[in-house]
Amino acid sequence: MIQKLKDFKLTPENTYYATGKRKEAVARVWLLRDRPNTFIVGSDKTNKEYDLREYVQRETLYNKIMYPFKVTGHEGKFGIYATVRGGGISAQAEAIMYGVAKALLQHNPDLRPTLKKAGLLTRDAREKERKKYGQMGARAKYRWSKR
């Protein structure tokens, strides 16, 4: 049975909050100090809460989310509650990872050099390129024949 957000009392004393973005995905992340190894993801699309492993399913995405804890040596010290909106599962996982890194920075500003060296404080700003008129897509063109 997964724990729900209503089971926790979120206060500034026991949580650290940050947002992470990647492509169209936006993640609001709370690190739960009193609840280590509790990982909940709430989807704004379905209005449900899931266990993190159940939500991302792929081990690589789960490891990506946990990477900030691994780099800083804070494995097993915090729980995660995150709400995600928009984008695909991979972009949502990267948004959560970025949010976790920023929340860890709130917990301890001395972690900045470690997180920066691991590349966790730089937002990946690549976005989808827009479709151009007179073309099939952003770069793909319709077939053209001179004669």
UniProtKB/Swiss-Prot annotation:
SUPFAM superfamilies: Ribosomal protein S5 domain 2-like. Keywords: Ribonucleoprotein, Ribosomal protein. The keyword Electron transport does not apply. Residues 128-147 are annotated as: Disordered. Pfam families: Ribosomal_S9. GO terms for molecular function: RNA binding; structural constituent of ribosome. GO terms for cellular component: cytosolic small ribosomal subunit. GO terms for biological process: translation. It comes from the Bacteria. The keyword Ribonucleoprotein applies. Transmembrane segments: none annotated. Belongs to the universal ribosomal protein uS9 family. This is Small ribosomal subunit protein uS9. It comes from Aquifex aeolicus (strain VF5). The gene is rpsI.
